[in-house]
Amino acid sequence: VIPHAPRGHITAHIADRVLFFESTGPFDGEIVEAVIRAYRPLLQRLADGGPFAHVSTFHRSMLATPAALDAFDHLLGEWRHSGLAPIANAYVAAADIEGRSLMMPIFASVFSGFSPFREFDRFEDAEAWVRQQLATAG
């Protein structure tokens, strides 16, 4: 658990080749940098075992500062460079999550050069999609 009130709170766990993040925003660059440092060993262990996927579920807000978006771009670059890229990425946010309509297109654009990305309103749909992607990957 990485608390950083009032600028983000992110927790993670792994279940059956899927890395799940629970993310409560808004987010600043410091929380994203903290995630990079804290979860890199976990991500490395997961990647060492073969293909994996990623689901982030957002609570309260998806808004992010420019510094957070820069740090996020750095995170994806590090994942790509280190061979830690998930084969699928799903973001889950209900329609009432602050900043959803603004941030989802930004995240979709950032992921476009990285690995498949889809947005969902419901966690169950996101999980089903990433599990399908994993099954297809073998």
Stretch-by-stretch model annotation:
Residues 1-138:
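Amphipathic, Lys/Arg-enriched alpha-helical "gate/interface" segment within cytosolic domains
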